[in-house]
């Protein structure tokens, strides 16, 4: 970037400061309106206008305070810069860029509309943006309803643009304006923006699903290929013909002994009840020897599998980590895709999924599931099962998981979707 380009961008940023400050204040007012419409029926944020707990009301009040502070700072910035930025220079800089800006004739109308909307929102929480406004005391509560014109003021009453009320509500006019922009045949920019957003969303969905499949398929494929390649190595170094080792742990050995004893008892039982012809001691010994050889081969193969699983899982883990290291862009897109799915669910769906997750992993019947998981993991790696370790794990890990989940609900979900938390508590009770 050369010096002239840098100077042009700096000048453009300076001349755009009033519009940028007003836009940020306008968006903060829109955020306050969204909270009022979604959670308080379009009324000011107050405990009188909703059936939320004190903690939820305090959360919403804190959010409104933050937005009011943004409005206060940005409007001060707008007033300061709007008096010093030359209009001619501002117009020149905007025309020099490729960014769309409203015509000079339309700009005052847009500014007045935004200031009117900001006055309408902030007027509900005190005079202008004074300390009383930040204290968040709604003026139109149920006990003493007031409007902008009812506020006590020692100064002469001056009618502002926001105090004027037309015959038609402004929200209806804004709706008609939006519809007009959407059906306007000249609004190619809006149509192009919609198409661009759709293509971006479609691309993000395709990349996310493809990345998820890669995370699952590639490690599994590496596991199977590694197991095939490792089998000769395991047979050569761990289980030779001269090696007396048949079992990798005592559990497999006990299972083999129980199976052999069961075969011996079955053989004797069939002879005693007449289901099989009587056999001599030599014949019985030969049959038991054949069964013992068969059992030894089966458990030797199971021991093979345990060693192969250890090495194959190591290769699969490295493959999984390698995919994550080289796919930072895909990870970011997957995170956004999952956020859209999770936070796009209704409050009841969120509460249902949370209750389902907690009941499965930390609920009353979860110890039985954890015990089965630990048994299969130990069998997968050829490790002797330890009842003491299983009980210790079941007594600690679900508790830690439950604590983490409750902290997540309190710290994050309560801030992002407090209504989902309220629904979760009602469903859980």
Swiss-Prot record:
Membrane topology per the entry is: Multi-pass membrane protein
Entry keywords, A to Z: Cell inner membrane, Cell membrane, Hydrogen ion transport, Ion transport, Membrane, Transmembrane, Transmembrane helix, Transport
Q: Name one GO molecular function term.
A: proton transmembrane transporter activity
Which GO CC annotations does the UniProt entry carry?
plasma membrane
Q: Which residues form the signal peptide?
A: none
Q: What is its main location?
A: membrane
Subcellular location, record wording: Cell inner membrane
Transmembrane residue ranges: 211-231, 306-326, 353-373, 389-409
Please give the HAMAP family that the UniProt record associates with this protein. Answer: CemA_PxcA (MF_01308)
Q: Which family does it belong to?
A: Belongs to the CemA family.
Quote the protein name from its UniProt record: Proton extrusion protein PxcA
**Organism, as annotated:** Picosynechococcus sp. (strain ATCC 27264 / PCC 7002 / PR-6)
Q: Which gene encodes it?
A: pxcA
């Amino acid at each position: 970037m050369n010096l002239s380009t840098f100077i042009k961008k700096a000048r453009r940023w300076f001349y755009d400061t009033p519009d940028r400050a007003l836009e940020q204040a306008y968006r903060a007012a829109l955020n306050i309106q969204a909270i009022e419409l979604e959670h308080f029926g379009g009324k000011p944020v107050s405990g009188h206008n909703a059936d939320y707990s004190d903690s939820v009301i305090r959360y919403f009040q804190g959010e409104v305070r933050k937005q009011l502070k943004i409005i206060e700072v940005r409007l001060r910035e707008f007033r300061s810069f709007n008096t010093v930025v030359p209009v001619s220079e501002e117009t020149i800089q905007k025309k020099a860029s490729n960014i769309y800006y409203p015509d000079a004739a339309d700009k005052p109308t847009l500014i007045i509309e935004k200031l009117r909307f900001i006055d309408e929102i902030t007027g509900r929480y005190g005079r202008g943006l004074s300390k009383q406004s930040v204290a968040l005391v709604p003026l139109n509560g149920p006990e003493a309803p007031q409007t902008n014109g009812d506020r006590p003021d020692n100064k002469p009453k001056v009618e502002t643009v926001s105090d004027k009320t037309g015959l038609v509500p402004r929200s209806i006019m804004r709706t008609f304006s939006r519809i007009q922009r959407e059906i306007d045949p000249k609004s190619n920019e809006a149509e192009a923006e919609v198409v661009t957003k759709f293509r971006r969303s479609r691309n993000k969905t395709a990349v996310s699903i493809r990345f998820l499949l890669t995370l699952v398929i590639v490690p599994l494929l590496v596991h199977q290929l590694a197991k095939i390649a490792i089998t000769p190595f395991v047979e050569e170094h761990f289980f030779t013909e001269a090696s007396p080792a048949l079992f990798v742990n005592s559990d497999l050995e006990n299972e083999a002994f129980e199976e052999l004893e069961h075969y011996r008892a079955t053989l004797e039982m069939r002879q005693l009840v007449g289901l099989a012809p009587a056999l001599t001691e030599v014949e019985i010994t030969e049959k038991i020897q054949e069964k013992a050889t068969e059992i030894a081969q089966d458990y030797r193969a199971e021991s093979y599998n345990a060693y192969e699983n250890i090495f194959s899982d190591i290769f699969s883990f490295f493959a999984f980590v390698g995919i994550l290291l080289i796919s930072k862009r895909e990870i970011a897109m997957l995170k956004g895709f999952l956020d859209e799915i999770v936070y796009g669910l209704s409050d009841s769906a969120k509460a249902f999924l949370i209750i389902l997750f907690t009941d499965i992993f930390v609920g009353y019947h979860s110890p039985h599931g954890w015990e089965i998981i630990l048994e299969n993991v130990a069998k997968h790696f050829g490790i002797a099962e330890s009842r003491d370790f299983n009980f210790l794990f079941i007594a600690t890990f679900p508790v830690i998981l439950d604590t983490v989940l409750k902290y997540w609900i309190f710290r994050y979900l309560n801030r992002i979707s407090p209504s989902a938390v309220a629904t979760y508590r009602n469903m859980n009770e």
